[in-house]
């Protein structure tokens, strides 16, 4: 049998077991844990290659044959870092493993059968991840949606109605009429959506009406009054309807301190936004809730990674987002109370420890909607450079750290909001919302985004050129974005109650509509690779953060990876 070098093999079929791949210009090294393709039986499309009739393609049509096969992909997922063919059928991942012609090749299962109806996409040399999920969206402008999509985010969860002051400050779509408006507006876009209703209501009937109108949960925000009563009522109704509650706590400690909020939560599950506190929350010690078993703690991306510029840029952002006035002393003091370098410095470290479980944007409201994925990987790289390899690593790679950080914007937000049955990972049975990356541009610029099994966005050259690659090459919407195809490729998530009442038919929605599930019986221990609980304290005078009695901090970076080098053109 003829043998070829690993270098030759990787150039033809992509990396195999034991090969290592650097992510962008970071120090993060992914090692291929397993290769499910079979040596000598690899799929390869093109002239003189194997993916053709009578060879790796069956001549016999069958009900199992795939709509699309992605060949030789390097899958980076919370489930593992491995090489496989990915089969897609009816908009879902039908199989992961060895694809091809089961009549001619060993190891091909029915769910990876290539037949006359199968399209091919060459995944060799590319990384495939699940689409990102951003759970902290202020729906201020619809232009956020293509921006997020081009970064690799395929699901947006949040609230708002446009550039109203309520939406500029809070991620809330309040009331039945506003929810109807946003659910109908969502029909236009290549993106999955879920909308959060106003939880600042001490009236169960008003809360319930919003869930039955299609909201997937509540947001409680201090600008609407985050009182213990509102917290208790929102959680009571959430428990009844099996939806999540997200919270931005009381920075000014007007209605109580962090201990009062935790008492009102009373051990029930809660998704805490920007849990460090610069984005809002009990000053100076909201960060301590991140260690609790019933809290699903998230960061927003303005504070990660911690850099020499982080503190300076926050003041102006905060004044605009929360309708404050620099000429009013109390407004300035309010802003100052939220911007604490000591707790921001601790945030990066808490991410590396797996105490913070989720990353999100806080779009146009102190956060950048197109940078969730980039900043998550910048934080991972900054922490490796500062603290070295994690103790959990096995072998000469960063696979554990990679899975930890990937989970923060994929599977964990999906679990938190009850959509992990559908999205959030590269697993059989889930919707084929996939992002394809060149390793050199990983975390910054996707090559292509597949939405519901079809290509929705891709880097594409001049449409008048003789081949697809001539300049100018930039992101262009593909066929899955157009016509009625976009209804098949995208999902609007609603509550089970709204789904059962026929909200899709009531509002005349044409997209897929699916119910959220299993939001209330989860805890921190369900957060993949980010389930660490701990006792966290904050010194009320110095703002230094202590985890189980030991101070945690990090240094501000003066240079980060995945930055200007990738944005020259």
Swiss-Prot record:
Swiss-Prot/TrEMBL GO biological process terms: urea catabolic process
Reactions the enzyme catalyzes: urea + 2 H2O + H(+) = hydrogencarbonate + 2 NH4(+)
Cofactor(s) for this UniProt protein: Ni cation
Any one Gene Ontology cellular component term annotated for this protein: cytoplasm
Domain of life according to the entry: Bacteria
InterPro entries: Amidohydro-rel, Metal-dep_hydrolase_composite, Metal_Hydrolase, Urease_alpha_N_dom, Urease_alpha_subunit, Urease_AS, Urease_asu, Urease_asu_c
Note on cofactor: Binds 2 nickel ions per subunit.
Main location: cytoplasm
Keywords (A to Z) from UniProt: Cytoplasm, Hydrolase, Metal-binding, Nickel
Entry keyword Cytoplasm: yes
Residue positions, PTM N6-carboxylysine: 219
Molecular function, one GO term: nickel cation binding
Chain positions recorded as Ni(2+) 2 binding sites: 219, 248, 274
Active site per the UniProt annotation: 322 (proton donor)
EC number(s) recorded for this UniProt protein: 3.5.1.5
Pathway as given in its UniProt record: Nitrogen metabolism; urea degradation; CO(2) and NH(3) from urea (urease route): step 1/1
PANTHER family the record matches: UREASE
Assembly, per entry: Heterohexamer of 3 UreA (alpha) and 3 UreB (beta) subunits.
Protein family (similarity comment): Belongs to the metallo-dependent hydrolases superfamily. Urease alpha subunit family.
Entry protein name: Urease subunit beta
Source organism per UniProt: Helicobacter pylori (strain HPAG1)
């Amino acid at each position: 049998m003829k043998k070829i070098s690993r270098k030759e093999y990787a150039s033809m079929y992509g990396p195999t077991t034991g090969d290592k791949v650097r992510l962008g210009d970071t120090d993060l090294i992914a090692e291929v844990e397993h290769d499910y393709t079979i040596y000598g039986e690899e799929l390869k499309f093109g002239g003189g290659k194997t993916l053709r009739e009578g060879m790796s393609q069956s001549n016999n049509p069958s009900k199992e044959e795939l709509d699309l096969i992605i060949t030789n992909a390097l899958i980076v997922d919370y489930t593992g870092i491995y090489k496989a063919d990915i089969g897609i059928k009816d908009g879902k991942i039908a199989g992961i493993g060895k694809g091809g012609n089961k009549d001619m090749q060993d190891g091909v299962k029915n769910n990876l059968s290539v037949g006359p109806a199968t399209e091919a996409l060459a995944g060799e040399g590319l990384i495939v991840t699940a689409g990102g999920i951003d759970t902290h969206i202020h729906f201020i402008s619809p232009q956020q949606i293509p921006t997020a999509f081009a970064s690799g985010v395929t699901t947006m969860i949040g609230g708002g109605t446009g550039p109203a002051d309520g939406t500029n400050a809070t991620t809330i779509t309040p009331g039945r009429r506003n929810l109807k408006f946003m659910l109908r507006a969502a029909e236009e876009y290549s993106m999955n959506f879920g909308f959060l209703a106003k939880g600042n209501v001490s009236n169960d009937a008003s809360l319930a009406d919003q869930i039955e109108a299609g909201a997937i949960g509540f947001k409680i925000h201090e600008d609407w009054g985050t009182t213990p009563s509102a917290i208790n009522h929102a959680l009571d109704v959430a428990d009844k309807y099996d939806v999540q509650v997200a919270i931005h706590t009381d920075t000014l400690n007007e209605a109580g301190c962090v201990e009062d909020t935790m008492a009102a939560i009373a051990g029930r599950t809660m998704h805490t936004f920007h849990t460090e506190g610069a984005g809002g929350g009990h000053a100076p010690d909201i960060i301590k809730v991140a260690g609790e078993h019933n809290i699903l703690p998230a960061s927003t991306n303005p504070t990660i990674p911690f850099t020499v510029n982080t503190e300076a840029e926050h003041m102006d952002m905060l004044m605009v987002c929360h309708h404050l006035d620099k000429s009013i002393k109390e407004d300035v003091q309010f802003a100052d109370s939220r911007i604490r370098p000591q707790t921001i410095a601790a945030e990066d470290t808490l991410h590396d420890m797996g105490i913070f479980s989720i990353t999100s944007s806080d779009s146009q409201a102190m956060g950048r909607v197109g940078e969730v994925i980039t900043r998550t990987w910048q934080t991972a790289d900054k922490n490796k450079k500062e603290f070295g390899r994690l103790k959990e690593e096995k072998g000469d790679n960063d696979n554990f750290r990679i899975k930890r950080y990937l989970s923060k914007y994929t599977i964990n937000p999906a679990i938190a909001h009850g959509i992990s049955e559908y999205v959030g990972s590269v697993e059989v049975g889930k919707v084929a919302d996939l992002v394809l990356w060149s390793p050199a541009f990983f975390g910054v610029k996707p090559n292509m985004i597949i939405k519901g099994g079809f290509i929705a966005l891709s880097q594409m050259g001049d449409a008048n050129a003789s081949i697809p690659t001539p300049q100018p090459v930039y992101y262009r919407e593909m066929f899955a974005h157009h016509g009625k195809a976009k209804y098949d490729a995208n999902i609007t998530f609603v509550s089970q109650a709204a789904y059962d009442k026929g909200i899709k038919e009531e509002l005349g929605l044409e997209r897929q509509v699916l119910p959220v599930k299993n939001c209330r019986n989860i805890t921190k221990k369900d957060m993949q690779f980010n389930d660490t609980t701990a006792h966290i304290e904050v010194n009320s005078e110095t703002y230094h953060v202590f985890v189980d009695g030991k101070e945690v901090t990090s240094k501000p970076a003066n240079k980060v990876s995945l930055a200007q080098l990738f944005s020259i053109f």
